[in-house]
Amino acid sequence: MKIIIADFQIAKYGGIVNYVKDMLKAFHELGHEVDVAQMTPTSTTQKAYDKKVAEFESGEHQRKIKFHSQAGGYEKDETVGYWYNTYYGYFLPPSNRIGVYEADAVERWKSLVSDADIILWNFMPTKSSAWDKKGVKFDFWWKFYDLPDRIKQVFLVHDAYFDMRASNVSALKDKLLFMACAHLAAYQCCANIGIPRSLLLNPRYIDEDARMPIKAMQRRTQDFFAAHMFKSMKHMEELIAAIPYLNKGVDEAFDVKIAGTGIEMNYMTSPTKTKQQYMCTLKRDPNLPKKLDGKISLWNRAVKFGMEYMGQMSGTNVQDMLFNTKFAIDPSWSDHYSKYCRTHINGFIIEAMLKGAYPVLRDYRGLSKESIENEIYDPLYENIRAIIIPWNATPKEFGLALQKAATMSPKKFLKDTLHNFELVRELFNSKKNAEEIIRLCKGGRKRVKKELECGTDSDNVRRITSDIMENFYGIELPIEWEE
């Protein structure tokens, strides 16, 4: 079979690019032909593409950008031969990167996928200025989905806000076989959309005979490591605020490294535009010495206590770091996610468990009305072996929890990390996900209707869909499909 993973371009891909990479490899290893395609607001040329690839290959691109640049950390996906990074996603040639405002854009797309069996969609146009070209209405983007029924189209859902941010997917239900949800929160929120859905957890490629790379706790020289995109939900500032308490009063400071980039990182480190929320204050930190109240940034104080910033690392370098790391930290929390789950296991934590690092996560209980009033059963939370820190922990409580974690016995560390590796092998396996997608696509609508849950478009979904499709793009609903 021929499988294409496609999207309408966005910024800030984050861990989704690793999802794509490992699914491509899984399909390829199962004997299928794979490719990547993207619809973009702007076109490119073969000359520009070749020049940039030459810079990637020679290392010139990495040498000429800033240490923390979002354009850093590019590496080559050997499965498809394209370069990618964790911020901008895949860098594609003109054959696979279609400028939607080109006169023949839809025809080029349909020619590219004419022999495809399955298309996995990551993103579609929502209410964004990126698709608002002056003088040109983008009221035809639905035509990229207007393909023959023999081509099975599946939408990949990565977001627990999907029923609000991308609810206009409901306008495409006649063309989508099902939605594949990458985590429990995404699956639960899609109950508000009238398209069948499956829970296929955020996958990683794992060889069938793979074993966890054993490296004893005492031989791992990196104490704590966190690599994330700096955005509001990640709450990297809370980890950074905890570092002075982690290293205060200890005989030998713990080694703490963080990596990643994003607009919030710029606000944390700017000498003149540091956001107030990224300053040390007694309001944030009741244990802060009064003389520091409003006088120093969280970032600068953490650096004084030993934090090291690694810039924008490639996926391979992150994995290498995790193999030498004792504790991998995800400081993120979200009141919206708390309606559906107790914690969120993202791609970084999955990578950590594959490399034998011990995860540190947040407990979402109490963040939302639903998490207080309802007993939310989260099977992943119940089964993962992790250090759990409450979402509302003070910087001192956070830091002392990390201190305590570091006293874990090597025996418990090994036992728990082996357990987590097997959990990933069983539940986050890209080959299993690929096989399930193929099985459902081969069975078609009859199998999907029989086996998968299907939600109902909520009033809110219908309202948002109408606003995006009709008011913003000028697309009359329901869509009259031509194919």
Map each language-model feature to its residues.
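Nucleotide-activated donor-dependent transferases that construct or modify glycoconjugates
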Residues: 1-13, 38-40, 123-125, 223-226, ...
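A short, glycine/small-residue-rich beta-strand->loop->alpha-helix junction that serves as a flexible
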Residues: 7-21, 44, 127, 232-234, ...
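A charged, aromatic-enriched C-terminal amphipathic alpha-helix characteristic of glycosyltransferases
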Residues: 15, 393, 407-470, 474
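Short beta-strand->alpha-helix junction loop in the catalytic core
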Residues: 159-161, 184-186, 195-212, 229-231, ...
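A short, active-site helix/loop in glycosyltransferases that binds the activated sugar's phosphate group
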Residues: 160-198, 235
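Conserved catalytic-core segment of nucleotide-activated headgroup transferases in glycan assembly
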Residues: 206-209, 216-315
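Nucleotide-sugar-dependent
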Residues: 316, 330-350, 360-371, 379-380
